[in-house]
């Protein structure tokens, strides 16, 4: 019974009201936003949803993937600023199990989220202008934090058009993500609980749990642009991100900044000035690297 509770609780992320919605954001900022609610289908047939802000025809797109326990609203402000600075198309999915009344009730700690990220990329690449032409350029960017960073990295290893990645506080594997959630939920950090959580999760997913390492995905990237971010607000993820930085092959252009006072892990609740500095760092990277490949 303990193992069943442990796994069930971990696979159901906490759900809270959105920090902000596009409608509230428009009222507060007096911007004429064109953010729309969109739906598509994941590769396993489950439904997916996200907010979409269309950019200029022929400009790149960026898909923004939040961390475990957060939701798309944490990065609405960041994505709007990215669109305003670059005219890129921006898509904010809710990862499975996240957001209000999620269409899929459970998270898989990155195992299924890799395919979900690929489905989001396929969706944004399917967008058309009113004249029927492709909306977005061939190259695109992926931004992710923690669980979202793992999904961004592992999906990019299978999607060569993902040319630019901003990866913040990256767990080493789905097991690493799972055990962090179990520690947070129970306050327990010992080998027995870790063993039970890992074994129970594999039984729960009936053989459909893939514990692929982030390092293996990094080695497979080839010629891409990657910005790795981490900081003191998530020290265990700073360690795994620094370890990840040593996995990339020489062909991958990697920039590493792991001494940040603020990361995307706490960005949704960060004070304004710190958040502005963080946003500018990521926006400038996407602007510089995606325009170079566009």
Residue ranges and their predicted role:
Residues 68-82:
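The serine-hydrolase catalytic nucleophile loop
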Residues 154-207:
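Hydrolase active-site cap/lid region
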């Amino acid at each position: 019974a303990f193992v069943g509770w442990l796994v069930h609780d971990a696979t159901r992320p906490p759900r809270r009201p959105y920090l902000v919605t596009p409608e509230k954001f428009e009222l507060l900022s007096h911007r004429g936003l064109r953010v729309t609610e969109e739906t598509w289908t994941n590769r396993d047939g489950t439904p997916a949803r996200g907010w979409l802000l269309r950019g200029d025809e022929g400009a790149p797109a960026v898909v923004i993937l939040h961390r475990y326990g957060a939701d798309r609203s944490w990065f609405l402000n960041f994505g709007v600023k990215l669109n305003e600075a670059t005219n890129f198309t921006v898509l904010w999915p809710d990862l499975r199990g996240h957001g209000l009344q999620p269409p899929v009730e459970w998270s898989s700690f990155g195992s299924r989220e890799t395919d979900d990220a690929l489905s989001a990329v396929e969706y944004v690449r399917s967008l058309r202008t009113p004249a029927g032409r492709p909306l977005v350029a061939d190259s695109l960017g992926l931004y992710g934090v923690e669980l979202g960073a793992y999904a961004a990295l592992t999906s990019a290893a299978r999607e060569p058009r993902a040319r630019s990645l901003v990866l913040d506080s990256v767990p080493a594997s789905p097991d690493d993500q799972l055990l962090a959630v179990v520690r947070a939920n129970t306050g327990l950090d010992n080998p027995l609980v870790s063993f039970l959580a890992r074994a129970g999760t594999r039984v729960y997913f009936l053989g459909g749990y893939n514990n692929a390492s982030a390092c293996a995905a990094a080695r497979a990237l080839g010629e891409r642009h990657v910005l790795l971010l981490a900081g003191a607000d998530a020290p265990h993820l700073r360690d795994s991100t620094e370890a990840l930085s040593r996995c990339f092959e020489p062909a991958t252009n990697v920039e590493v900044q792991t001494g940040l006072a603020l990361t995307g892990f706490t960005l949704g609740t960060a004070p304004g000035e710190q958040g502005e500095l963080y946003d500018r760092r990521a926006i400038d990277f996407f602007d510089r690297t995606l325009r170079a490949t566009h």
